[in-house]
Structures are given as C-alpha cells and as structure tokens.
C-alpha cells in the first residue's frame, strides 16, 4: 500500500487547483460565451459574469439553489486524504456564498490498472468530509482515464436575500483571511519529494478543513462580500473581489499567514507553474511596496487548493467576527487588510 500511496501524486502532471486552466486561457474561452440580455433568466441570481464561486438560481422568494462543481488531480499521496481535500474544496464554493450544502455527486476519473482499493479509499475520504458538512451523497459518475481525478458537484440552498457574493466589498471594510496560504508550493514539493509526508501534514490539515465555521460565523454577523482562495491564488481572487466591487484592496504583506517551509521552497524555485501564470495575468492590477522581495511576491500568486475564505466586513464588526471564528477553529483567521477607494493613485490590489 505504501508504494501505491507514493504513486498517487506521480500519476498526473499537476497537483490540485494548480492544474486548472490558466487565467489567460480561461478568459479566452469565456469571452465566446455570451448571454444576450433578452435571453437572461431572471431567476439566475448569480452566474459566471463576475467570476463568483457558485451559481445561484431562485426557486421561491425565500429559497434559491446554490450549485458548484470542482474536481482535480491528487494533492496527497494518501488516497483517503486526497478524497477529503477534494470534497472540502468543492464544498467551499457553497460556503463562500453563505449557502448550506445539501447533496453531492461524486466525479471520478480512474485507471483500472491502479487498483479498486485506491479508488475506494478516495471515495471514502470524500464521503466522510461530505458527511461532516451535513450533506448527502446522491450518486456520481466515473470514467476511465490515465490520470486520477476526483471531485464533487454540490447543490446547496440559500435565502435569496442573504446571498454573499464576491462583488459587495465596501470602502472602509476590513479584510479577514481564514486559512494560511502556500498549499500549491507544498503540494508541488511533495510531488517531487522535496519534503516528506510528515512535513506536508500542516498543508494536509489546512486543505482538509471545511470552510464551514467561517461561513456560519459570517452569516451570523453579516458581511459585505466573500470569496474562497483557490486556483488563482490570493492576489487573483482578491482582484476578482476588488474588480467586482469597484473598489481597491490594501493588503498588509506582514499580516498574510503563510504555512511553514513555503518561503524556503520558493527560494529554491519549488512552486507550481500556476504561480507564474497567475502572476502574468494579474500583475498589471497589482502594486507592490518596494520592501516586498521576489520570494514573498511569488508566494502571493501561489494557486491554492481548498484555501480559506477572504471576507470583507464592516470594520465595527471585524474584531467580533475574527474572535468568533477563532474561538471555534483550530486554524486561525487573520485580519490582513482593508477596502479603500479605487482612484488614479492606486491599483485594484495594493500590497504594502
């Protein structure tokens, strides 16, 4: 079994959300998908026009469906852990919108040469995480593929009047990040055996942790905007929030939580290609303080798998929200910045 575990991450070219389409390539594809104004369904409350985390479709005045799908290649050598992380990552999009997950459909690509016991462990990990979220597996789909892939399509519910989008940040708000960054660097390092499974444990725990607590607490207190940090990295998803909200974000580089060993690995150029793709696409919208070195700069573009929530909340409620999250969560959230006015003297993202 140990040999099989170590093979798992060797069976694909990329790891997790680092294997997503680059932002440039995705933009080229999506520009051809145009929905004419007269064809828009008024019940589709949230679509893909602002790069939000999930789609939201109104069913009645007090209920809407939240729908999302996410799957990817292995981010851990242990099949069960991979299943947990993949499910947590998919569920996160519903949590980011302030929704409650209800049902899930498994999506699995698998080669019969690997062994059915490995797939069974992956599905078990996913099932346990979905159960932890209070959702139910309703079915799934499998297909033969040389690369192992697993993920989940999730359906949740939300009150239409309480949808939290990535485009509601307000000037004066405080920014809270609920998980440390660096998972892309660490999964890459594990894949090429720069680090051991023991050194990967922090990243494994962070990625397998549901964003349930952060979501529940932000719904209780009321927030302006939220998104989860995944394949486009902290800067990419922060930019989507800023652009969608028509504001600028000022982020303190010293406040951003980063997992252990990440910067040392980046110094050795051990990071996924997705970090460079993110940098290429988003750098024109970012201003960096001169004090920030290249290692730190690249780390902020690192594509995350099952990353934390980036929450924009009124400054008068920020400390209370932070305390409420941290009282319940082993992984500590941090205040990392604030929302400011976008003007001719700044850019949408300003790292100080």
Give residue spans per PLM region.
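Helix-biased detector of long, well-ordered alpha-helical tracts
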Residues: 1-352
